[in-house]
């Protein structure tokens, strides 16, 4: 059932958004307001939001800037962090857009996109693979063109006014951008999908396989059609003010290859060389190294902890890194993300690397979980068993154990109220999930 913007910006709905999504958050914008402070004036703050939105007077505060490395010789990704009040408003807008228009969009998680690619490769229908990367995608989205797209979807004028306010806000006072959607906002992804929807529709053709995940495009087609299809996508992108990386055999950004040649997409390597023909899908070396470095960092932290060194904490963090977890009813972690690989040789090598790290640091390997077993459990849909921690089902005793590991205190010496333990537990879990997500944050 569709909802309008007036139904979205009610006191009760905004309060529910705050309590569900942000009440335990420790992230702050430029005003440094935490939920602890916001909660003291929660009712008044929410009433102010409702009033200002109703009269089209709501203004966003400039965003805090966070830079995320994309690797050597690359400009970092610029992430916008809104204030708590703005995050509530943005989440409400996102909910409005998702509930009303998501059925008109083809939004997929990377794993499903990868399964579709695998299926099409195995069909034997195609001869050529075209991989296209859009340059500076989010910073290049033209606002007036985006507004036209939103209007064509039927987005209400009051919602468009709010969206324009949000995307024109920058990192400096009085900044009024006309181009670019800040990355990191809860509305960024759905706006990008709506912006690209017309290209997706025009590229839909029964004679080709077309897949786009944000700014990464993969097309499978016949050899004779490849140049024309490539030029068509380039033309349509240019019409939206977007530029693509030019076809360059020496680059991995945009390429046109025979379908049996090695190529990468969404962090996966297809037809990897020089492995044998039994391996169809592996992962990029950079993705593998990022995971290995994160595991090695756990042992380094353990070695440097001195008197606070805890094998229990090391085992907990290490096994969590290896298997991933279930939290907030979602599968999280490196192996869940790359669950479509069939490169068991690589996983055996990584298990062996972890074993050697244990030996080097005099840590018993017996209690360490295995990537090779975890991938088997995932592929056979057995990840609901005890091999993977399901934090949603943890009882109070288990939560207390996690908090005690993290603080280096025996559970019986932990002097916290039940609510404090609950808050501390989810703060730890969210911290570890964010840390795991950095292992897969850059796959394009």
What does each of the following model-derived ranges do?
Residues 32-36, 44-50, 119-120, 124-131, ...:
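Charge-rich, low-complexity segments
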Residues 266-444:
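Active-site and adjacent loop segments of nucleotide-processing enzymes
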Residues 51-74, 160-171:
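Reverse-transcriptase-like RNA-dependent polymerase core
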Residues 4, 89-142:
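Active-site-proximal segment of RNA-dependent polymerases
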Residues 119-214, 218-242, 246-262, 307, ...:
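Conserved polymerase palm-domain catalytic core
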Residues 76-105, 177-205:
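Conserved pre-motif C helix in the palm subdomain of viral-like polymerases
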Residues 2-62, 69:
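A structured, charge-rich N-terminal accessory region that forms the first stable segment of a protein
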């Amino acid at each position: 059932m569709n909802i309008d913007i007036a139904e979205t910006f009610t006191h009760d709905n905004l309060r529910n958004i705050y309590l569900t999504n942000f009440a335990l958050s420790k992230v702050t914008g430029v005003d440094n307001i935490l939920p602890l402070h916001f909660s003291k004036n929660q009712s008044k703050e929410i009433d102010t939001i409702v009033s200002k939105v109703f009269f089209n007077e709501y203004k966003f505060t400039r965003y805090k800037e966070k830079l995320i490395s994309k690797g050597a010789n690359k400009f970092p990704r610029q992430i916008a962090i809104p204030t708590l009040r703005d995050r509530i408003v943005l989440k409400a807008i996102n909910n409005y857009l998702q509930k009303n228009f998501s059925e008109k969009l083809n939004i997929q998680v990377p794993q499903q996109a990868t399964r579709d690619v695998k299926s099409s490769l195995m069909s034997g229908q195609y001869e050529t693979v075209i991989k296209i990367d859009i340059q500076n995608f989010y910073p290049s989205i033209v606002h007036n063109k985006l507004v036209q797209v939103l209007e064509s979807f039927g987005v209400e004028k009051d919602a468009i006014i709010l969206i324009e306010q949000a995307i024109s806000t920058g990192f400096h006072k009085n900044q009024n951008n006309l181009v670019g959607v800040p990355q990191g906002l809860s509305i960024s992804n759905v706006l990008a999908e709506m912006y690209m929807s017309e290209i997706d529709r025009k590229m839909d053709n029964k004679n080709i396989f077309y897949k786009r995940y944000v700014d990464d495009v993969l097309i499978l087609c016949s050899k004779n059609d490849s140049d024309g299809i490539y030029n068509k996508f380039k033309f349509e992108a240019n019409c939206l003010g977007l530029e693509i990386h030019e076809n360059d055999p020496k680059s991995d950004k945009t390429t046109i290859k025979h379908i049996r040649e090695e190529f990468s997409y969404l962090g996966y390597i297809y037809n990897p060389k020089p492995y044998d023909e039994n391996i169809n899908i592996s992962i990029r070396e950079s993705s593998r190294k990022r995971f290995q470095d994160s595991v090695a960092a756990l042992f380094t932290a353990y070695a440097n902890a001195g008197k606070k060194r805890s094998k229990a904490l090391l085992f907990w963090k290490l096994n969590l890194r290896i298997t991933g977890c279930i939290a907030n009813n979602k599968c999280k972690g490196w192996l869940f993300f790359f669950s479509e690989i069939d490169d068991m040789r690589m996983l055996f090598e990584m298990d062996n690397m972890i074993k050697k790290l244990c030996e080097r640091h005099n840590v018993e390997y017996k209690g360490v979980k295995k990537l090779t077993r975890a991938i088997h459990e995932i592929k056979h849909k057995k990840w609901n068993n005890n091999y993977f921690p399901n934090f949603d089902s943890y009882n109070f005793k288990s939560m207390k154990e996690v908090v005690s590991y993290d603080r280096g205190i025996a559970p019986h010496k932990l002097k916290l109220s039940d609510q404090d333990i609950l808050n501390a537990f989810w703060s730890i879990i969210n911290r570890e999930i964010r840390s795991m997500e950095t292992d897969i944050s850059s796959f394009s």
